[in-house]
Swiss-Prot record:
Pfam families: DUF2303. GO terms for biological process: viral process. It comes from Escherichia coli (strain K12). InterPro entries: DUF2303. This is Uncharacterized protein YfdQ.
Amino acid sequence: MSQNLDATAINQIHALISAQGVNEIISKIGADAVALPENFRIHDLEKFNLNRFRFRGALSTASIDDFTRYSKDLADEGTRCFIDADNMRAVSVLNLGTIDEPGHADNTATLKLKKTAPFSALLSVNGERNSQKSLAEWIEDWADYLVGFDANGDAIQATKAAAAIRKITIEANQTADFEDNDFSGKRSLMESVEAKTKDIMPVAFEFKCVPFEGLKERPFKLRLSIITGDRPVLVLRIIQLEAVQEDMANEFRDLLVEKFKDSKVETFIGTFTA
């Protein structure tokens, strides 16, 4: 028993002496920490202090104005903003520091633009197969943002375009051709299917809205396709969606670069990991 106590005491004395040596090293580098004899684990004393030793935190917002104002107010030497335009996202690292005096890079502000309700509705219908009823109802729901166009390019009110879609009928016509020769005969049968409506039929639409909060309003051109069958299936598709998304990304990037102009925040295109 005494041998066990002696061994335990020796281990504790060894741990205390080792911790003292570690603390002497910590005090020389000016770190706010202490080593305790618990497998020589370093314990941060900040939580026992009245105030934090340094400011740090992580802001997350969908507001461009709040993001830029917060970033500029807390910006210090070496503050950087990294713009991920493809994902409509940006991160300001407020304590990145410099090469000579690097910071901890744990005080950040993150901006993630939010899609507006009209733009989300537009993306939800893009390329989807709709019945007459469902597409007509969608057009009526978002009529304030829509205008239709006929085959001649003339504008049609959204409500009238919805009414025309509700009245689409499918007509099938058969044509038989016969050919007689002295020694043979040939017959061909052709069927044509056509979608018609009693009203003026829209062939395209324009949907105008603000796609993301903080960006400008822009028009989106849509093409209407009809798949004929027993019942018509209607598909709305955004024309050159990728090109429009690229334009929005460029607008987002240019907007942030302009807002941080003449401030301590330097902007970069891309992402950053500390």
